[in-house]
Amino acid sequence: MTSPCKHGDRPPGRHDLVFVSPAGWRAMLDARDDLAADSLLARWPKMRWPTIRRRALPHEATGVALGLPLPPSAGKKRVALLVEIDHVASVARPPSLQQARAYAPRNWWPTLDRLDGLALRHSVDARVYGSLAWQSLTGLDYVTGRSDLDVLFEFRSETDIDRFVADVAAIETSAPMRLDGELMSADGAAVNWREVHGGASELLVKSIERVVLLDRHQFISGATGS
């Protein structure tokens, strides 16, 4: 479903899927006594399911910070992991809308199709994260009747951001779920699409390294201040 690349091709970034080697999994789980008895987590290396890149905590000075959200049946527990870079087998982007479509509730399909068409018209690469992404990656039940659709909109320099978010808002009016998600620039910095649509002059910009407030026009022009 995803298209992994070797970790040396580029460092794992925000929302990236990170596939860990068997040795890496052993090292991670051996370091965590609290995870030893988790039978669901033990399936991850056996099934070769990915983890997701997350922002490192202040005390995590070395290694690659990873996350793993368990499904509602396991209490939606979020597992924080840390692995040495040499144990990163490959990295992939999140699933595309079309890749995830078959795993979504049928009443979500028209919304996914409309968003996919919208992304194509606006030169945007649209991908899913959150519950639908994990359901498509693992086959486990993550999506519930209260789930949002989380979409990552990776825009380009030619994208008309204001028009695009207005069109996303229009699609949401007839969607059976809440549309959540982020607009991501080429350097990996991202903002919530609703903040942009709401006309905020300053935006909360998230990257893999930090969270900062940035002038709206700076973010849209690609000047993230990094």
Curated annotation (Swiss-Prot):
One of its GO terms (molecular function) is nucleotidyltransferase activity. It holds the Pfam family MdcG. InterPro entries: Holo-ACP_synthase (IPR017557), MdcG_C (IPR049180), MdcG_N (IPR048903). Keywords: Nucleotidyltransferase, Transferase. It comes from the Bacteria. It catalyses: apo-[malonate decarboxylase ACP] + 2'-(5''-triphospho-alpha-D-ribosyl)-3'-dephospho-CoA = holo-[malonate decarboxylase ACP] + diphosphate. Its EC number is 2.7.7.66. It is an enzyme of class 2 (transferase). The active site is at D148, D150. Belongs to the MdcG family. NCBIfam families: malonate_mdcG (TIGR03135). Transfers 2'-(5-triphosphoribosyl)-3'-dephosphocoenzyme-A to the apo-[acyl-carrier-protein] of the malonate decarboxylase to yield holo-[acyl-carrier-protein]. This is Phosphoribosyl-dephospho-CoA transferase.
